[in-house]
Amino acid sequence: MTGKRTQIIPAQTSHLDAVTALEALTFPEDAISKRSFRRFIESSTADFHVLVADARVIGYTVVLYRNNTNLARLYALVVDEGFRSRGYGRSLLQTAEE
């Protein structure tokens, strides 16, 4: 991942507006709702991380886990169009795999 001021951190409720806006831009006809993103933050069976660059959310991942199994599903992986082809998606995926 390139960039000196980028970090991948667990999503917080303060990120919801930015994530919801990015989701709507990326998937205008099938966007995940703000309510669902809030549930992912609160859920013990979800990992929701955001990629932040200079205090701006530029990407995120959501991984959902099935109860009582070793199964996980990458539910969402988004990088802002203006930040693609810089390794950010790869970094988000690596974090999701951890």
Question: What are these language model-derived features?
Answer:
Residues 3-6, 10-84, 90-95:
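Acetyl-CoA-dependent GNAT
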